[in-house]
Structures are given as C-alpha cells and as structure tokens.
Design a protein with these regions (language model features):
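A structural signal for short, well-ordered beta-strand segments
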Residues: 54-56, 83-85, 136-140
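A short, acidic/glycine-rich surface segment
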Residues: 41-42, 63-69, 94-95, 123-125
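A short coil-to-beta-strand element that immediately follows conserved catalytic motifs
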Residues: 43-54, 94
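A generic structural micro-feature
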Residues: 48, 73-81, 128-130
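Conserved short histidine dyad/triad with adjacent acidic residue
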Residues: 56-75
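Catalytic core of Fe(II)/2-oxoglutarate
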Residues: 79, 89, 93-146
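Non-heme Fe(II)/2-oxoglutarate
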Residues: 1-47
Length: 146
C-alpha cells in the first residue's frame, strides 16, 4: 500500500512511498512509538502528541538528498523527532552515507539500526553509486518548537 512519488528539486532524488496507518501497517507504527517513547524520555524530553508520519525512501544509483532540515512551515512545523531505520544491509550499496553538519564521520548504520535526531539538525544522504538503499523514515509530532 501507500502512495508512490518521485521528487527531484536539485536537492533530492529519491523514490518516496508514504505508509498510511492502516491495520496492515499498525505494527510498524506501534513498534516505532514504543522506541520513540523510550528514547525521547531518556534523551530529548520533547512534548510529543502521539502522531507519526511514515515514509519508505528509495535511493538508487545517483539518488541523494542534499543538506536539509526536516523542520519547516505548515505541516512540517510539528515534527519533533526524525527517525531513520536502515532497511538495506550496507554491503548491498555504495555511497549513500548519512552525514550530519559538523557532527563527525559519515554514518553507515547496519541493517535494522535506527538513528533518532531532532528535525532541526542539518543532514544529508550522499549519492548512491551502486545498488539500492532503502530507509524507513518517520517523524514524531508534537506542539511546534518555539
């Protein structure tokens, strides 16, 4: 299920499939909600409202996402945490490293690993040069930061 789209604004080249909170997908939302609750309580202490949006991103060769933040106006203003789960083993693709601005080395997490960070942290995905890289990306929502 889900809606599939292709976006390329010179900043991003990824396939995107939105995952709706239907009965067949609820187990994903429930698992992520449990993880987000524990991590938020331990590390961030952000006010969350239980709402979550979820996409699968596909990066094929030449796929990338340049420097950006996940926070913005309108519907993007209530994002409180970005949650990225690696669906592809790192040996299945080349390139596609996750980088954070001024935060050290490029990240190449293992399949099944999840990275959680505030949506105001600038980050990017380097171009994939071989294979395909799939990630499950979620945003936990709450009152907009002030």
């Amino acid at each position: 299920g889900g809606v599939h789209s292709q976006v390329d604004y010179g900043v991003r080249r990824t396939g995107i499939r939105h995952i709706p909170p239907t009965p067949e997908h609820m187990w994903i939302f429930e698992r992520l909600a449990n993880l987000i609750g524990r991590v938020n309580q331990a590390a961030f202490h952000f006010q969350l409202d239980g709402q979550m949006s979820l996409d699968v991103l596909e990066y094929v060769p030449t796929g990338f996402f340049d420097w950006h933040v996940d926070l913005g106006p309108g519907i993007f203003s209530t994002r409180k945490l970005t949650i990225v789960t690696m669906l592809t083993p790192p040996e299945a693709y080349e390139g596609g490293n996750l980088l954070f601005l001024d935060k050290g080395e490029p990240m190449r997490p293992a399949q099944g690993s999840t990275v959680i960070f505030p949506p105001y942290m600038a980050h990017k995905v380097e171009p994939v040069t071989r294979g395909s890289r799939y990630t499950l990306v979620a945003w936990a929502h709450g009152p907009a930061f002030t």
